[in-house]
């Protein structure tokens, strides 16, 4: 996948399904290392939204800014990313 926003990545994580159900790895340090992504988990949240729900932008100014790992566990989601780093060549770009 190619994105307009500099630094935006998609990780393909392990997924296996058989007659018993399925098994998915939701975090794998090696996946981040292969993409040369310095990522350290500080917090983890799970949210369940009803159909048609629109959630707000997530942004923190330094020194509180941090990377985001977004996963859709069931159903589907449209996750929109907006480049707000004014020093980035992709400033103002949008990807989803």
Which residues fall in each region the model found?
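Non-catalytic, conserved peripheral segments adjacent to functional cores
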Residues: 1-96
């Amino acid at each position: 996948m190619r994105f307009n926003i500099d630094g935006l990545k998609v990780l393909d994580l392990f997924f296996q399904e058989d007659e018993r159900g399925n098994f998915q790895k939701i975090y794998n340090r090696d996946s981040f290392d292969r993409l040369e992504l310095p990522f350290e988990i500080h917090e983890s949240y799970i949210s369940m939204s009803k159909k048609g729900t629109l959630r707000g932008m997530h942004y923190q100014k330094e020194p509180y800014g941090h990377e985001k790992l977004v996963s859709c566990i069931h159903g589907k989601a449209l996750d929109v990313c907006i480049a707000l780093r004014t020093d980035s060549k992709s400033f103002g770009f949008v990807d989803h």
